[in-house]
UniProtKB/Swiss-Prot annotation:
<feature type="binding site">
    <location>
        <begin position="189"/>
        <end position="191"/>
    </location>
    <ligand>
        <name>prenylated FMN</name>
    </ligand>
</feature>
<keyword id="KW-0831">Ubiquinone biosynthesis</keyword>
<comment type="subunit">
    <text>Homohexamer.</text>
</comment>
<keyword id="KW-0464">Manganese</keyword>
<comment type="pathway">
    <text>Cofactor biosynthesis; ubiquinone biosynthesis.</text>
</comment>
<feature type="binding site">
    <location>
        <begin position="194"/>
        <end position="195"/>
    </location>
    <ligand>
        <name>prenylated FMN</name>
    </ligand>
</feature>
<dbReference type="GO" id="GO:0046872">
    <property type="term" value="F:metal ion binding"/>
</dbReference>
<dbReference type="InterPro" id="IPR002830">
    <property type="entry name" value="UbiD"/>
</dbReference>
<comment type="similarity">
    <text>Belongs to the UbiD family.</text>
</comment>
<feature type="binding site">
    <location>
        <position position="238"/>
    </location>
    <ligand>
        <name>Mn(2+)</name>
    </ligand>
</feature>
<keyword id="KW-0210">Decarboxylase</keyword>
<dbReference type="GO" id="GO:0005886">
    <property type="term" value="C:plasma membrane"/>
</dbReference>
<dbReference type="InterPro" id="IPR049383">
    <property type="entry name" value="UbiD-like_N"/>
</dbReference>
<keyword id="KW-0288">FMN</keyword>
<feature type="binding site">
    <location>
        <position position="172"/>
    </location>
    <ligand>
        <name>Mn(2+)</name>
    </ligand>
</feature>
<feature type="binding site">
    <location>
        <begin position="175"/>
        <end position="177"/>
    </location>
    <ligand>
        <name>prenylated FMN</name>
    </ligand>
</feature>
<keyword id="KW-0285">Flavoprotein</keyword>
């Protein structure tokens, strides 16, 4: 199933019984969070709050509240189908030379399809049906959520931020939270290693003192939103990837006040600039860790223009202790990561990011071990291969007889196959999530790897234990008579 825009996706969800319209007035201050949180924990539907208290614009929440809806938004009918998307990205990340003419012909359709999915620029777009400029710009028109009691104020959460560095041919898409601090000002919380921050830094170096153009798309189609959080290879733009997911080219339109191109079917567009040197203290806000983050200083984005569709929808979410939408996204995108990792490390049989680990802070890897030290090579590879795992604090590696998604199995492997001193790898002074207050220095901390595999000669001098395995014939015999025994 393909979706041309967010409204089409909402309509399809409603037809499948996956969307609930809430007509009762509900406040964006705390109340929507409470309702969305309860719904998500019960694996419930997406929610369209049609009458937010004090606003005319409806709020769409819990959109990606189940892994199945994430998969549906990426054009797949099941979560397992996301492995095929991962295989495509793995191929594009490191394409293998054709083994012959027949192999070259077989791969040609893939490259043709990618070339055909280059974004299409249009002159007229529904995201610019209404234009608000100058003194008329007022972010108070948007029903921006205040999610938690200790939050300092309203927070834009699903904004797709579009930037372009002076030395780059392609735009960058990133999702950064934005604290509303005035009629036309928000704080752009992008970390120093993220694409938007890097573009801004390069701009300041090349154009010192000049304002940096920025645009933010709210309510883009699901393929474009999810493309921005997927490990797309550098050779492929997020817009082209979204086109592959959607099955047709992503339509873009040039902004009214700058040269940036934004999704033409988005609900709301914020256009403006960041003035170099204009900073403000951001936070505190409740975050995906389950804690309020520290206050820190980030650039201020001045909104000069708001364009939107007629009767727009405001897409929002909250973050808190898992499960929340980022954790659910992590569960679904986990299936995309597996083939990408397996392309680099074929010995990996499964990879799992438990949602309890705040989406990415812990990874469990199962593998076919072939030599002493093999598990350590794999854990170091996980930390270094994809930038998405730069902040993963704990990597547990087990043999392939362990189910990575079953804590009973994983804990059994840790407690029976590990010597704490020999099999623990500690790495100090590594990049850590700035929201991780447990690290001694902001943004810099340690990582731990646990080798919970069977040990080979060279790793131990002792005879290694044999796993107890039941007799298959006896198991079959008891299966056959089990009902007659009347035990349960």
């Amino acid at each position: 199933m393909k979706f041309k825009d967010l409204r089409d996706f909402v309509q399809q969800l409603e037809q499948r019984g996956e969307l609930k319209r809430i007509q009762m007035p509900i406040s964006p201050v705390l109340e929507m969070t409470e309702i969305c949180d309860r719904t998500l924990r019960n694996k419930g539907p997406a929610l369209l709050f049609e009458n937010p208290t004090g606003f005319d614009i409806p709020v769409l929440g819990n959109l990606f509240g189940t892994p199945e809806r994430v998969a549906f938004g990426m054009g797949a009918e099941s979560v397992s189908e996301l492995r095929e998307i991962g295989k495509l990205l793995a191929f594009l990340k490191e394409p293998e030379p054709p083994k012959g003419l027949k192999d070259a012909w077989s791969k040609l359709p893939i490259f043709r399809k990618i070339i055909a999915m280059a974004p299409k620029v249009v002159k007229d777009a529904v995201c610019q049906e209404v234009v608000i400029e100058g003194e008329d710009v007022d972010l108070a028109m948007l029903p921006v959520q205040t999610c938690w009691p200790g939050d300092v104020g309203p927070l834009i959460t699903w904004g797709l931020t579009v930037t372009k560095g002076p030395n780059k041919d392609r735009q960058n898409l990133g999702i950064y939270r934005q604290q509303v601090i005035g009629r036309n000002k928000v704080i752009m919380r992008w970390l120093s290693h993220r694409g938007g921050a890097l573009d801004f830094r390069e701009w300041c170096e090349k154009h010192p003192g000049k304002p940096f153009p920025v645009s933010v798309a709210l309510g883009a189609d699901p393929a474009t939103i999810l493309g921005a959080v997927t490990p797309v290879p550098d050779s492929l733009s997020e817009y082209a990837f979204a086109g592959l997911l959607r099955g047709n080219r992503t339509e873009l339109v040039k902004c009214r006040g700058n040269d940036l191109q934004v999704p033409a079917t988005a609900e709301i567009i914020l256009e403006g600039v960041i003035h170099p040197g204009e900073m403000a203290d951001e936070g505190p806000y409740g975050d995906h860790t389950g804690y309020y983050n520290e206050v820190d200083s980030f650039p201020v984005f001045t909104v000069e223009r708001i364009t939107h569709r007629i009767k727009p929808i405001y897409h929002s979410t909250y973050t808190g202790r898992p499960p929340d939408e980022p954790a659910i996204l992590g569960v679904a995108l986990n299936e995309v990561f597996v083939p990408i990792l397996q392309k680099q490390f074929p010995e990996i049989t499964d990879f799992y990011l438990p949602p309890e680990g705040c989406s990415y802070r812990m990874a469990i890897v199962t593998m076919k071990k072939s030599y002493p030290g093999h598990a350590k090579r794999v854990m170091l590879g996980v930390w270094s291969f994809l930038r998405q795992f730069m902040y993963t604090k704990f990597v547990i590696v087990t043999d392939d007889d362990i189910n990575a998604r079953d804590w009973n199995d994983v804990i059994w492997a840790i407690t029976t196959r590990m010597d704490p001193k020999r099999d623990t790898v500690m790495i100090d002074n590594t990049p850590i999530d700035y929201l991780d207050f447990a690290s001694p220095v902001s943004g810099l901390g340690s990582k731990m790897g646990l080798d919970a595999t069977h040990k080979w000669p060279g790793e131990t001098t002792r005879e290694w234990g044999r796993v107890i395995v039941k007799d298959e014939a006896v198991t079959a015999r008891v299966d056959a008579i089990w009902k007659e025994l009347g035990i349960d």
